[in-house]
Amino acid sequence: MKAIPLDKSNVKLLGRALVRDDILRRTLSGTGCEFVFTGCRLTLTVGVDADCHNDGKRCNMPRIAVLCDGRIIVKKVVEERAERFDVVSSDAPETHTVRIVKLSEGAFSLAEVSHAEVDDGAVIAPTAEKPLKIEFIGDSITCGYGVDDSNMQSEFSCEAENAMKSYACVAAELLVADYSLFSYSGYGLISGYSADGERNTREILPRRYESCGFSYSSVDGTKLQDIPWDFSAFVPNVVVLNLGTNDNSFCTFHNEAYREFEDEYLSFLRVIRRCNPNAHIICSLGIMLTEPLPYIENAVRRLGDDRVSVFRYTTQDGLLGFGSNWHPSEDTHRRAGEELAAYVRSIL
């Protein structure tokens, strides 16, 4: 057996995953890697980052999945610095497609893949790039928060998150697209979630967009928000923006703030366009609420870019159930993903 670091030479990185010091860091929702394995034995070593491990709060520990040929063989919360998972064990060489995905978001913890252990004759190679690439920018809905928990009164826990079931990953799968998610629970444009009308300035997404993300954990002492993102690493054909739900919690207390939301939405669209000059930008909303939509439409009109459009999802009404804290259920995410995929097909 031999140990092989996983990096861009032998795997396809998913989302804004980082490789530093021969360790693959899965940061944001949906990040990870995918590769084709040919050999007899494959064991992966995965761990939680040191900061989160030392903190010891299980609700913040990363949740991950390992898939072999599309079948989930591991789905769990990672609580240790190093946990080993046997993926392939055979007497004769076999070929399999393996995907390692972080199901939970990046704010509270990172998941690390230190290496793969394989038999001496084994080969690991990246899977092929898909012709369509989509970036999704959003909040807890895009993270898939609550989709694996039907208790509407649950306290926040990363264990309730499953990015693979989010509308974003559903749409990407239907469109046979590579995806990148940039999403954080509670985040907005002018205010993060507010239960009392006080402006939440801690959770503002645009200030993080041009970095590798945000996390209370660090990568070898460096915060994600201090690492610039290289936009040439993933060049999307489509960018889907799904923000406004958390801003609405603030704006309902301060009706005049909707105009500020519109101005900031316009400013962020200009940032997205600068970073993604050739992408079609879809400004979407509606899975949980629709009040900010007129202001989003105004911002798009003011931008005057014919490759920016507005899309409205069917709003949840409870008939398909709810996840944690009134978040969308798996069936609601499936419906939204199907709606979005159909819209993307119509504009490309």
Q: Model-derived features: where do they sit?
A:
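N-terminal secretory targeting modules
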Residues: 1-137, 141-163
